[in-house]
Amino acid sequence: MVQRIVLLMVVGVAFTHSIADAHYLWVKIDQGNGDHGTANIYFEHSAAAGDGHYLDPFLESKTTWIRTVAEIEPKRLSLVEKRAEPDKRWVETPLPAKNPRSVDSYWLFGVYQYGKTNVLLHYYARYLDVDSHEDLHELGRADQMALDMVPHDSGRKLELRVLWNGKPVPDSVVHVRGPKGYKHNFTTDKRGIVRLTIGEDGEYSFRTSFEEQKAGKHGEEQYESIRHTATLMMTLPLSE
């Protein structure tokens, strides 16, 4: 009986961890909604509307910007919470300019307890809505994002550099997902770069994280470390 209780406790803890670990911040653009499209922002396992269970801690901290080639400086956007049946909840913002553009979002979750360890969680998400190599070069880097993934294309070849405060991050795992079930994980080299060949045309997502072994206090809560997680989405290959 004791063994069974212990096992259930372990499973319960693992399940709690899996819920927290499996949620990430995502930006997607609905091109057909509004004059210039609408950015939908989700905090879910994947880039789609879910129950929005973990949205509440973000209510005072979420910030989203748009950058265009014509206006490269980030312009802050107003966000509106949306709900749909059954039990769908997300955040959206109408976009004031057409592509080429980058929609960049940063949200601070706060302190989350993993087992006995309190971790301060930061989330970053971007959608690069570009068609050409030149536009990608202009919009690829989001300077306001502490953790960023910067793509560089050459035909069907793609390099992605992971940056922390503008500096390359070696040995960082980058999770890549794409059309027709494409799924592969890469590790950055000493220059913070991963390289891949684009197979099927379509929308790709990239995800990485960075850990700071730094203790501190957020509000009234103490934490032992800081975790930053970033996602990037874009359609590949570029047409020009």
Mark where each language-model region is.
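N-terminal soluble domains immediately following signal/targeting peptides that reside
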Residues: D21-E240
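Positively charged n-region of N-terminal signal peptides that target proteins for export
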Residues: M1-I5
